[in-house]
UniProtKB/Swiss-Prot annotation:
Top EC class for this record: isomerase
GO biological process: mRNA pseudouridine synthesis; tRNA pseudouridine synthesis
Record keyword Isomerase present: yes
A Pfam family: TruB_C_2
Family the entry assigns: Belongs to the pseudouridine synthase TruB family. Type 1 subfamily.
Keyword Plastid assigned: no
Reaction(s) catalysed by this chain's protein: uridine(55) in tRNA = pseudouridine(55) in tRNA
Organism: Neisseria meningitidis serogroup A / serotype 4A (strain DSM 15465 / Z2491)
Purpose: Responsible for synthesis of pseudouridine from uracil-55 in the psi GC loop of transfer RNAs.
CDD domains found in the cross-reference section: PseudoU_synth_EcTruB, PUA_TruB_bacterial
Protein name: tRNA pseudouridine synthase B
Alphabetical keyword list: Isomerase, tRNA processing
Active site: D47 (nucleophile)
EC number: 5.4.99.25
Length: 306
């Protein structure tokens, strides 16, 4: 019988460069195995076809993962114009064709039209749930579920390369944006079809692909070297204001009480809390009407002291 490596408490964030061909969950489990971590989760699904930045949260960092899921993101997408696929990407079958002799001017106009605050219908091949099941399970059976359009923001679409029928675009967008659908909508604006042949997430919440690490590189390191690549848990909430509390106020938070706090901040604002010696305590919510802090997500005492 083969003995499995003993799991250990690991706390922090690893910026993974997910390879093509792996689901986000498979990439997560491989990373978790390398670190022998007791608990792990990722922040935002990437399709198996897609590569790039996938922040992996270990241990106490999973408490704050939701704040990164909601962050803006950036992608580099490669489109093939003139062909629609059943999945919106290269993994599906070609189901329709149209003109592919698109001019750069036409493509630029379409990209401009899809920039800004827009509404987007999520694709059937997505992890969104309907009656407890992800939409892609219905799609694989040929069942189409009606989806409501959602408000998203496309901050910028920059054309990195254009040689029809191939186009490469850099997209900066809000959470919940489906690049496959965006590519199809760009083509629809021109009067043709398109599908993705490659997709790479290059940025999320200020983290860039240059900061990430491949599974292969991680496997070639020893445990101490791998651990040195972990970012502290509070990087996930670095965009929130911070405050320092004395030991008594920190104790109050941990006991479910609400220490006094007064700042020029909107009510309900999450605030990063630190001890006087710089340890991250967690997130608290500012209740402006009573000038108090209410605990939202707090680090485990032992992890906070580490």
């Amino acid at each position: 019988m083969t003995n499995k490596p003993a799991k250990r408490p690991v706390n922090g964030v690893l910026l993974l460069d997910k390879p093509e061909g792996l689901s986000s969950n498979t990439a997560l489990q491989k990373t978790r195995h390398l670190f022998r971590a007791e608990k792990a989760g990722h922040t935002g699904v990437l399709d198996p076809l897609a590569t790039g930045l996938l922040p992996v949260c270990f241990g106490e960092a999973t408490k704050f993962a939701q704040y990164l899921i909601n962050a803006d993101k950036a992608y580099t997408a490669t489109l093939k114009l003139g062909e629609a696929s059943s999945t919106g990407d290269a993994e599906g079958e070609i189901v329709a064709t149209a003109r592919a002799d698109i001019s750069l001017a036409e493509f630029q106009t379409a990209c401009q039209a899809l920039t800004g605050n827009i509404r987007q219908v999520p694709p059937m091949f997505s992890a969104l749930k309907h009656e407890g099941k992800p939409l892609y399970e219905y799609a694989r059976k040929g069942i189409v579920i009606e989806r409501k359009a959602r408000d998203i923001t496309v901050y910028a679409i920059d054309i990195a390369e254009f040689d029809a029928p191939k186009a490469v675009i850099d997209v900066r967008c809000s959470k919940g944006t489906y690049i496959r659908t965006l590519s199809e909508d760009i083509a629809k604006h021109i009067g043709t079809f398109a599908h993705l042949t490659a997709l790479r997430r290059t940025e999320t919440a200020g983290f860039t692909i240059a900061q990430s690490h491949t599974l292969e590189a991680l496997a070639n390191l020893d445990e101490t070297e791998r651990d040195s690549l972990l970012l502290p848990c509070d990087v996930l909430v670095a965009h929130f204001p911070q405050t320092v509390l004395n030991d008594y106020a920190v104790h109050m938070l941990r006991c479910g009480q609400r220490p006094r706090f007064e700042e020029d901040l909107p009510s309900d604002t999450p605030v990063r809390v630190y001890t006087e010696n710089g340890r991250f305590v967690g997130l608290a919510e500012y209740q402006k009407e009573i000038c108090r802090l209410k605990a939202l997500r707090l680090m485990n005492t032992a992890a906070s002291a580490a």
